[in-house]
């Protein structure tokens, strides 16, 4: 059998790069060292800042975190507070009295009806204050001349049992406007998906101008976590993030010890946090590294080369020179690349890079 010089040179170069002729006691530290060398050879060293000696870090807003994976710091998080403005859900005019949920006025009572739809954000947060802004159209003289025995404005909410009074207090307001501050006991009203408010103002007139549309102002903050949520947050984090491929490795049935004695493709879950590069390589957080491992104890005489396109089995050695000792190595041309996303400025810019010939697809005794 005559081996072509080009094939011989290719196999020699593959052996030099893979470093697969290791003993059966191949440890994790050696694999990690080899992986780090392959990454540094393909991507170069990470950009360093002037003080910490690590990749440059800039603090990012929480919404810029990648894939929900955030680096935890010892600094306290900012309180989640917000302000929301709600307008009536329907836009009926004064002339369109029959529109469902629109603006309606009963002249004999001066009753105005408004339908609000609080957002999911408001319903999931704790309301700390709420005000209803209503355009009365009355100047201060008209307000003072009104009957003092009855309040100028009454606020009611439509419930299953009929209209119910809402406790409010009048606050400072611009001319021709009224600001009704809802009492704390009325804050749960904003947790309903539909809120129907009835405002009674006998002296007020209906106005269909857009600039006189009433609105609700609600201030909210995040709810205090429950006992279960606090327990989940206080649980210690795993040393590295798990991936679906790593879970499949754990869930597969156990193998016979003899299966690991011969040349085979081994797998190792590696995270960039474990390598100290989680601030440089931001995606993926981890990957499954495949490499060749095992011995080649089969006889080395009179075995043909494998058929092109069909990877050899672990018991099918491939020889360079007759009489040479075979070594468990990756089949030439079967290495797969890994695409990663890196950053050198803490997340303001990203770069897609490729680490070629990193993951082994097929192993053989060469």
Curated annotation (Swiss-Prot):
For biological process, the GO terms are: hemoglobin biosynthetic process; male gonad development; negative regulation of follicle-stimulating hormone secretion; ovarian follicle development; regulation of cell cycle; regulation of cell population proliferation
| Organs and tissues of expression | Mainly expressed in ovary and testis. Alpha- and beta-B-subunits are the predominant forms found in testis. Also found in placenta, pituitary, adrenal gland, bone marrow, kidney, spinal cord and brain.
Q: Provide any one GO MF term from the record.
A: growth factor activity
Cystines in this chain:
263-328, 292-363, 296-365
Q: Which residues are glycosylated?
A: 147, 269
Which protein family is named in the record? Belongs to the TGF-beta family.
- For this entry, the protein name equals Inhibin alpha chain
What is the source species? Rattus norvegicus
Q: What is the lineage of its organism?
A: Eukaryota, Metazoa, Chordata, Craniata, Vertebrata
């Amino acid at each position: 059998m005559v081996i072509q010089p080009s094939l011989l040179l290719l196999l020699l170069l593959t052996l030099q790069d893979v470093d697969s002729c290791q003993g059966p006691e191949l440890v994790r530290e050696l694999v990690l060292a080899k992986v780090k060398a392959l990454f540094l050879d393909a991507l170069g060293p990470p950009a360093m800042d002037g003080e910490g000696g690590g990749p440059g870090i800039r603090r990012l807003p929480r919404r810029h975190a990648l894939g929900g994976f955030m680096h935890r710091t010892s600094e306290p998080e900012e309180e989640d507070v917000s302000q929301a403005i709600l307008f009536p859900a329907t836009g009926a005019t004064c002339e369109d009295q029959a529109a469902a949920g629109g603006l309606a006025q009963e002249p004999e009572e001066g009753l105005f009806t408004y339908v609000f739809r609080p957002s999911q954000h408001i319903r999931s947060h704790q309301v700390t204050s709420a005000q209803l802004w209503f355009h009365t159209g009355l100047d201060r003289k008209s307000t003072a001349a009104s009957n003092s025995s009855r309040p100028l404005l009454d606020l009611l909410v439509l419930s299953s049992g009929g209209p119910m009074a809402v406790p409010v207090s009048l606050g400072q307001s611009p001319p021709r406007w009224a600001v009704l501050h809802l009492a704390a006991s009325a804050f749960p009203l904003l947790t309903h998906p539909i809120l129907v408010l009835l405002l009674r103002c006998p002296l007020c007139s209906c106005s269909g101008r857009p600039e006189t549309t009433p609105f609700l102002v609600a201030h909210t903050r995040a709810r205090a976590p429950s006992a279960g949520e606090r327990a989940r947050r206080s649980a210690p984090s795993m040393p590295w993030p798990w991936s679906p491929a790593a879970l499949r490795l754990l869930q597969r049935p156990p193998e016979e010890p003899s299966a690991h004695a011969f040349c085979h493709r081994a797998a190792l879950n590696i995270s960039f946090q474990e390598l100290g590069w989680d601030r440089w390589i931001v995606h993926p957080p981890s990957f499954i590294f495949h490499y060749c491992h095992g011995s080649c104890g089969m006889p080395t005489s009179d075995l043909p080369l494998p058929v092109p396109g069909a990877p050899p089995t672990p018991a099918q050695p491939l020889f360079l020179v007759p009489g040479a000792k075979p070594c468990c190595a990756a089949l030439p041309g079967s290495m797969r690349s890994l695409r990663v996303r890196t950053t050198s400025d803490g997340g303001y810019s990203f770069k897609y890079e490729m680490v070629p010939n990193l993951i082994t697809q097929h192993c053989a005794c060469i």
